[in-house]
């Protein structure tokens, strides 16, 4: 573009790629101002079960974007999911317009915790759940540290709360099934400091930008 004379700075053509630009003020391409990088934004979405975490599905199933069309505030930028939730998993799904923030939150090395509540059937002890703190290998796949606790039990039915810092495919379900439990409902209740709270199914709410900036400041790869 520079060689073609399409880039200008304060009305003068830029002749070399080595031109120092402290910011994008006064820069145009084909006569159009180049905007500053859009500020990172983060949204909490209460994903209902039965939606695919994808933009489109080759099988024609409903995706999260089907639900988001009417749920997102007007003039919202295009957003991407942070991680994913399986078809039948519900609860907190974070959405952002910032690719660097998305990647940083997904990386296991960032140590961002994800918390789930699982309704299960079967026999399990608190001691068995506490063993997951050391991680577990299932069919050759290593799953890292998981903090797990029995929350409530009625007969052989119980709710289990689990917190982990990685997001391998179907990790929570596979670990619980490995313990002999059948999972009938799985809800993500938190991702980092951002909680589902009282957000109704299908609703979206933006994270306060000051709160997001504080969180970003502690991330190793996505500082504002």
Label every model-predicted segment.
Residues 1-224:
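Basic, flexible Lys/Arg- and Gly-enriched helix-loop patches that mediate nucleic-acid binding at interfaces
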């Amino acid at each position: 573009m520079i060689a073609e004379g399409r880039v200008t700075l304060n009305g003068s053509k830029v002749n070399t790629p080595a031109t120092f630009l402290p910011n994008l003020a006064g820069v145009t391409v084909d006569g159009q101002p180049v905007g500053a990088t859009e500020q990172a934004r983060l949204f909490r979405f209460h994903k209902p079960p039965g939606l695919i975490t994808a933009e489109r599905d080759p099988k024609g199933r409903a995706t999260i974007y089907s639900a988001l069309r009417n749920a997102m505030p007007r003039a919202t930028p295009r957003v991407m999911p942070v991680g994913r939730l399986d078809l039948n998993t519900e609860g907190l799904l974070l959405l952002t317009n910032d690719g660097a923030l998305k990647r940083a939150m997904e990386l296991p090395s960032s140590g961002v915790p994800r918390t789930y509540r699982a309704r299960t059937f079967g026999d399990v002890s608190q001691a068995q759940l506490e063993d997951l703190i050391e991680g577990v290998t299932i069919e050759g796949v290593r799953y890292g540290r998981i903090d797990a606790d029995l929350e409530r039990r009625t007969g052989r039915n119980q709710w289990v709360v689990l917190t982990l810092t990685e997001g391998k495919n179907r990790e929570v379900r596979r670990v619980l099934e490995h313990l002999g439990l059948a999972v009938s409902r799985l809800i993500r209740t938190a991702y980092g400091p951002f909680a589902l709270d009282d957000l109704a199914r299908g609703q979206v709410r933006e994270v306060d930008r000051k709160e997001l900036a504080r969180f970003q400041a502690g991330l190793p790869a996505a500082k504002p």
